Amino acid sequence: MDIHQNKILSQCHTLMLDMDGTILDLAYDSFIWLDLVPKEYAKKLSINLDEATVILKEHFVSLKGSLKWYCLDHWSELLGIDILLLHEKERSRIGYLLGAQEFLEVVKQSDIRVLLVSNSHRDILKLKIEETGLDQYFDGIHLSHDFKAPKESRLFWTRLSSIEEFDLSKTIFIDDTPKVLRAAKEFGIHSIFQIIDPDSNQPRSIEIKYPGISGVIDLI
C-alpha cells in the first residue's frame, strides 16, 4: 500500500501508539489480573475466590489511573505475590491484536516516525518484546515510569514533549483508554483514535468517547 494515498496517514509526521489493547491483545493482561491474580491471592490468604476478588477490586479502584496502578513492584509488595513470575508463566498468551502487525509493517515502510507510548512496567515490556519482537517497528519507546507520571496526566505529555519533538497538528495518537486520550487531546494532539476492540475475549468497549476504530488496521 502507498501510505501517501491514505487520507489520514498521509498528513501524519508522528504516530504514537499505545501497546496493550492497541497493538497487543489485552486478553493476556486481563487473564493475569482478573483470573490468575485473584486465584493466587485467595490461595495465599486462604480465603475463597469471591473474597479475594472483592479485596482486589477495592485496591484496583483506589489506584486506577495512577502510576502505582501500573507498577509491578507495588502490586508484588502489596499482595505478597510475584506478579512478574505470573506474567512469565503465561507468556505464551501474549500476541498481537488482529491486523496490528500488518499495520506496523506498513507504517514501518513510510516516513512516519512511530513511537510506542505506554504505561507498561519495563519488565513487562521486555517480556512482550521477547515474545513478539514489537520493538523493531518503533523509532522510540517511552514508558510512563520513565517520566514518573501516567499517560492520564498532563505531566506525562509535557515531559514527553521535552525529549520528543513533534508537531501537534501532524501527530496521531491511538489508545484504548478514554482518560488517556482525554489527556492527550487536552495537551493539544490533533488526531486521536480510540480502540474499541482491545480484548479479543471481551465484548466491544461501551465507553467510546473519541473517534473509534476496531483496530489500528482500520486506518489503512
Each model region followed by its residue ranges:
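Short glycine/serine/threonine/alanine-rich loop segments
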Residues: 47, 81, 112, 166, ...
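N-terminal helical cap/lid subdomain that shapes the substrate entry/recognition surface
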Residues: 7-102, 121-123
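Asp-based, Mg2+/Mn2+-dependent phosphohydrolase catalytic module
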Residues: 1-15, 105, 121-122, 126-220
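Flexible coil/turn residues that form the inter-helical turn or adjacent wing/linker of helix-turn-helix
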Residues: 68, 110, 177
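Catalytic-core regions built around general acid/base machinery
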Residues: 99-111
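Short active-site oxyanion
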Residues: 111-115, 168-171
